A protein has these predicted regions:
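Domain-level signal for soluble alpha/beta catalytic cores
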Residues: 1-168
Length: 168
């Protein structure tokens, strides 16, 4: 990862986002690169359910590691991406119970990927992503967006959720 980070940083990046981390070990390696370079960064995990990274580590364990601010002083935010939206609220709650860092979430569209047929299944339900996004903001997410299979309509719904959240 280091050569890519150096290229991005030298090109003028404001921070480096290490995303879709399937494991705590990979995230620690990536954090070590950024800390070694003395640059600001985010770490975002991909999760298999409402409590575990894709390789199975409890998300609380990941947060405990990165809550060591003396070890990770350049870490600006932690997050979850490339994960089904139904798991995000619980993940935010678990993360916020441990970390003082801001939490970012940008899940997939809600469709399900079939690795055998290499196809996505499910339909976009108007308004559902907005409901989820509002839930995520209420649970404490500081940044909300979209990952795989999200389109402009999803982000429009995030914007509507933000308006509702700010006008409460």
């Amino acid at each position: 990862h280091r050569p890519r980070v150096e290229i991005l940083w030298d090109a003028g990046a404001d921070l480096i986002l290490f995303e879709t981390c399937p494991s705590l070990e990979e995230a620690k390696v990536e954090a070590g690169i950024a800390e070694g370079m003395g640059i600001p960064y985010w770490i975002s995990f991909s999760c298999q359910d409402g409590g575990h990274t894709c390789e199975g580590t409890p998300i609380e364990e990941c947060m405990k590691e990165f809550e060591q601010r003396e070890k990770y002083p350049n870490l600006q935010m932690v997050g979850v991406n490339c994960t089904h939206p139904q798991y995000i609220t619980e993940l935010i709650r678990r993360m916020k119970s441990i970390t003082s860092l801001p939490v970012a979430v940008y899940p997939n569209s809600g469709e399900i990927y079939d690795p055998v047929t290499k196809t996505w299944h499910g339909d976009f339900v108007s308004g559902r992503y907005e409901q989820w996004a509002l839930e995520w903001m209420e649970a404490g997410a500081s940044a909300v967006g979209g990952c795989c299979r999200t389109v402009a309509k999803h982000i429009e719904e995030v914007s509507h959720a933000r308006e509702k959240f700010l006008n409460r």
